[in-house]
Amino acid sequence: MGIDIERHHVRKSQRSKPASENVYLKLLVKLYRFLARRTDSRFNKAILKRLFQSKTNRPPISISKIAALTSRKSASLEGKTTVIVGTVTDDERLLTVPKLSVAALRFTKSARARILKAGGEVLTLDQLALRAPTGSNTVLLRGKKHAREAYRHFGFGPHKHKAPYVRSEGRKFERARGRRKSRAFKV
């Protein structure tokens, strides 16, 4: 006699592989899937999960943000390798780049050049796997997910100060009722 289960043919909601067809990403997934299985390290499981994520969920992080987070006295991150599953971008507002050790999925050309010029090192995630197979002496960071322009529009409602989708940015558009006291009310 069989058991009648309510949940028939229900797919798991989380990703089990990246949606991207990028062969280099697939090789990294293969590597970190092996490491996550064979080592008892939560670091490798976290890296693997982030490799599955969509591009919008792998936001970029700037070298100025990395420098600010690693230079904190309380964090005690001296000599540790910063790991980012995403892109490391340059920030021209940062005048002097400190000596950094960064491992990431990809780097912008100028970010890579500035880190290397400062005497730091730039690693790929497969090079990191050889150096720290269990993630020892590393710190995992990620960029701000809600920094995208699209997030200005999400969650619309009263008193939320969300940006409306407008057909034009001119004086006559979305500037009247609800935006000025003289036109009924101001939110």
Curated annotation (Swiss-Prot):
Keywords of the record, alphabetical order, are:
Cytoplasm, Phosphoprotein, Ribonucleoprotein, Ribosomal protein
- Carrying Phosphothreonine, the residues are T134
Q: Kindly indicate whether the keyword Cytoplasm belongs to this entry.
A: yes
Pfam families, per this entry? Ribosomal_L18
What domain of life is recorded for the organism?
Eukaryota
One GO cellular component term: preribosome
Modified positions (Phosphoserine) are: S136
Q: Which GO terms describe its molecular function?
A: RNA binding; structural constituent of ribosome
Tell me where it resides: Cytoplasm
PROSITE patterns registered for this protein in UniProt? RIBOSOMAL_L18E (PS01106)
Q: Which GO terms describe its biological process?
A: cytoplasmic translation
Where does it mainly reside?
cytoplasm
PANTHER family found in the cross-reference section: 60S RIBOSOMAL PROTEIN L18, LARGE RIBOSOMAL SUBUNIT PROTEIN EL18
Any remaining note in the record?
A: There are 2 genes for eL18 in S.pombe.
Q: In UniProt terms, what function does this protein have? A: Component of the ribosome, a large ribonucleoprotein complex responsible for the synthesis of proteins in the cell. The small ribosomal subunit (SSU) binds messenger RNAs (mRNAs) and translates the encoded message by selecting cognate aminoacyl-transfer RNA (tRNA) molecules. The large subunit (LSU) contains the ribosomal catalytic site termed the peptidyl transferase center (PTC), which catalyzes the formation of peptide bonds, thereby polymerizing the amino acids delivered by tRNAs into a polypeptide chain.
Subunit-structure text: Component of the large ribosomal subunit (LSU). Mature yeast ribosomes consist of a small (40S) and a large (60S) subunit. The 40S small subunit contains 1 molecule of ribosomal RNA (18S rRNA) and at least 33 different proteins. The large 60S subunit contains 3 rRNA molecules (25S, 5.8S and 5S rRNA) and at least 46 different proteins. eL18 interacts with NAP1.
* Family assignment from sequence similarity: Belongs to the eukaryotic ribosomal protein eL18 family.
Question: What is the protein name stated in its UniProt record?
Answer: Large ribosomal subunit protein eL18B
Which organism is this entry from? Schizosaccharomyces pombe (strain 972 / ATCC 24843) (Fission yeast)
